[in-house]
Structure formats: C-alpha cells, structure tokens
C-alpha cells in the first residue's frame, strides 16, 4: 500500500518501475469500483446480491478501518477507499432490502437481515483493528486484504456448490473483480521483485498459498460461469 510506504526510501530499481506499480493500483481500484457499481445495478433490478454475506461484511469492515482508523496519507488511495466504502454501503442496503426474497428459506435471516449485517460488519471491523494493533497497519492492510479475498473466492465457490446458484453473479461481475485482484497481485510482485528489503515477505509460504487458493477458486468459479 503506497500510503504506508516512504517512497523516498525506495531503491532505484523500484523507482524505475513505480509507474507500472501505480498503473496496477489504478486498474485494481477501477476493477473493484466497476464490480461494486454492477452489484448495485443488479440489486436495484431486484436481483440477489452476488457476494455472500460474510465476505460483504468483511469487505466493508476492511475499507472502513483504512478509511477512518488508519487512513492512507496518499490522497488518491484514500479517495478510492472512500468511494469503495460509499458503494459498499449502497450494496449493503440493497442486500438488506432484498433479503426477504433471497432468504425466504430462512425466516429469521429474512426478518433480521439488516441487524445481522450490521453485527457482521462490527465483528469484522474489530477484527481488522485488532490485527492492525497486533502487527501494525501497513502489514495488517495487506493481510486483511488477503483475508477478504479468500473469504470472497472460497465463499463464492461454496455458494455455488451448496445452492447450485451463482447468487446473481454475471460474467461482467466476476471478470471485473478477478482482473482487479490480479492487478493487486501484479503490484505486489513488483514490490517483492524490486524492493525485497521491505517486501520480501510477499514471497512467504502463506502468501503463496493464499495466491494459489485465490487463483484456483476464482478460476473454478469463472469456468462454472461459462458452463
């Protein structure tokens, strides 16, 4: 995350590819913003939310933490977070409104969807804050993003297997979020390759496992959409 990095300390090798890193960040934000806008559009048409409940709460909580509690000094990055939080809240309200039809098989969930979503956000929010207090906001930002991505990718596949339904996901929705996340991987690769003193940990076994899990889960989901 640029906002937590002192670019004056970046090695010359990284400074030479910084333009490419910033391009990846731009397209990462663009991909996810397009995904959020499409989710709102589908919800307004009365279609179900394409994101499972826990990943939705987790995403909103993560964005809130790094918008309010640990805001990025990078104004462009902060603006992207504010836009993401705003759109995610619109998604949340749409999901709460459509809960009666989407969760008709669970009367308790259908009746108290709004309260359950708020409770889920609070739980995830405090978890992300606790992680930042434990390992520092710079590392917690990245690990929090990993948690959000895995919850979304694995949750989507589980939803597909359990309900035999994409839950409203379309090809455009999937491709925008997948490409946005792939741009984040490209950005992380440049950090690891050209700034190993600070970002060598991005090649740790757990990060590589998380990357492999994300790719397998999301590509599996994409193939299922085509079938």
UniProtKB/Swiss-Prot annotation:
Keywords: Lyase, Membrane, Transmembrane, Transmembrane helix
EC nos: 4.2.3.-
Transmembrane segments annotated in the record for this chain: 20-40, 51-71, 76-96, 113-133, 135-155, 173-195, 206-226
GO molecular function, one term: lyase activity
Subcellular location: Membrane
Main location per the UniProt record: membrane
Induction of the gene: Expression is down-regulated when the stress-activated mitogen-activated protein kinase (sakA) is deleted.
Pathway: Secondary metabolite biosynthesis
Pfam families: Pyr4-TMTC
GO terms for cellular component: membrane
Topology with respect to the bilayer: Multi-pass membrane protein
Source organism, top-level taxon: Eukaryota
InterPro entries named in the record: PaxB-like (IPR039020)
Signal peptide: none
Protein function: Terpene cyclase; part of the gene cluster that mediates the biosynthesis of lolitrems, indole-diterpene mycotoxins that are potent tremorgens in mammals, and are synthesized by clavicipitaceous fungal endophytes in association with their grass hosts. The geranylgeranyl diphosphate (GGPP) synthase ltmG is proposed to catalyze the first step in lolitrem biosynthesis. LtmG catalyzes a series of iterative condensations of isopentenyl diphosphate (IPP) with dimethylallyl diphosphate (DMAPP), geranyl diphosphate (GPP), and farnesyl diphosphate (FPP), to form GGPP.
Family membership noted in the UniProt record: Belongs to the paxB family.
Protein name as it appears in the record: Terpene cyclase ltmB
Originating species: Epichloe festucae var. lolii
């Amino acid at each position: 995350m640029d906002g937590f990095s002192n670019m004056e300390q970046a090695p010359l090798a990284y400074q030479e590819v910084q333009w490419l890193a910033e391009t990846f960040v731009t397209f990462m934000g663009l991909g996810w913003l397009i995904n959020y806008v499409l989710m709102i559009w589908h919800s307004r048409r009365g279609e179900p939310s394409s994101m499972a409940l826990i990943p939705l709460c987790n995403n909103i909580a993560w964005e809130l933490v790094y918008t309010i509690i640990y805001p990025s000094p990078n104004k462009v990055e902060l603006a992207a977070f504010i836009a993401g939080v705003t759109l995610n809240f619109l998604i949340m309200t749409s999901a709460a409104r459509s809960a009666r039809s989407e969760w008709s098989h669970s009367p308790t969930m259908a009746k108290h969807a709004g309260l359950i979503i708020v409770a889920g956000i609070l739980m995830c929010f405090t978890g992300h804050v606790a992680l930042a207090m434990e390992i520092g906001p710079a590392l917690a930002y990245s690990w929090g993003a990993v948690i959000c991505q895995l919850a979304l990718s694995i949750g989507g596949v589980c939803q597909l297997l359990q309900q035999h339904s994409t839950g409203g996901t379309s090809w455009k929705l999937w491709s925008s979020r997948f490409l946005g996340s792939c741009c984040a991987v490209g950005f992380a690769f440049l950090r690891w390759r050209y700034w190993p003193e600070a970002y060598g940990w991005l090649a740790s076994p757990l990060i590589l496992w998380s990357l492999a899990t994300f790719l397998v889960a999301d590509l599996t989901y994409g193939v299922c959409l085509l079938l």
